[in-house]
Amino acid sequence: MNVVVDTHTHTLASGHAYSTIIENARSAQNKGLKLLCTTDHAPEMPGAPHYWYFNNQRILPRFLHQVGILRGVEANILNVKGEIDLPSSSDQHLDWVIASFHEPVFAPASEAEHTAALLNVIKSGRIDVLGHSGNPNYPFDIERVLQCAKEHNVAIEVNNTSLTGKSRKGSDVRCDKIVEIGKEVGVYFTTGSDAHFCEEIARLELAIALLEKYEISEDKIITTSTSRFLNFLLLRGKPIIPEFDSLY
């Protein structure tokens, strides 16, 4: 499987990452990526930037080191209502919105509460993908949530860092189940390194191996071509990005 998009990466702006967007783009180029989503942590995460930072991504060039740059965020799910920590006025400035649970923002609660939060954030229409949902601290009704994601064209991330065991220990078992059920349901999958240092960009081997284990069709893995990824954004109702015209 050839993956040409990394949909989950962080820069210095996240507060606990160690590279600039230029360094990330250079690493992406060296590793053969065509598109890179820059997705710093949203404001409620300790050390994260103000929402102006995300709005101001409109000044970023569409290409850095010949890699297309998608302007994104890793938003925090705040509550069972599925609210996220950016104002709706920010949506117009963002190409790619990940929604994730993080312990400092949403304290682990019950399976019912986690499920409600995920269903509601999907139904909000404000997010494109659920991030690192295999975290064992946040059990949820996998089948219900994935069915809802399918109905609303929200992708499910396979997070490589979760599978390494270096973060969110114990995620591998739940990630395996999520991919297994996701295949049955027919969701779209995406692959994210969750890089917090430029050398981790495009480190997706474990995510790819898990998708291959369940023989997920490449037309359901939106990071396997620029066309699949960009047309998924169109499916989500995002406008065409003119600078990427030749990549659709």
UniProtKB/Swiss-Prot annotation:
Its EC number is 3.1.3.-. SUPFAM superfamilies: PHP domain-like. GO terms for molecular function: phosphatase activity; zinc ion binding. One of its GO terms (biological process) is bacterial-type flagellum-dependent swarming motility. Its cofactor is Zn(2+). SMART domains: POLIIIAc. Gene3D superfamilies: Metal-dependent hydrolases. The keyword Membrane does not apply. It comes from the Bacteria. Zn(2+) 3 binds at residues 74, 102, 132. It holds the Pfam family PHP. Zn(2+) 2 binds at residues 16, 41, 196. Keywords: Hydrolase, Metal-binding, Zinc. Zn(2+) 1 binds at residues 8, 10, 74, 194. NCBIfam families: PRK09248.1. Belongs to the PHP family. This is Probable phosphatase VF_A0065. It comes from Aliivibrio fischeri (strain ATCC 700601 / ES114) (Vibrio fischeri). The lineage of its organism: Bacteria, Pseudomonadati, Pseudomonadota, Gammaproteobacteria, Vibrionales.
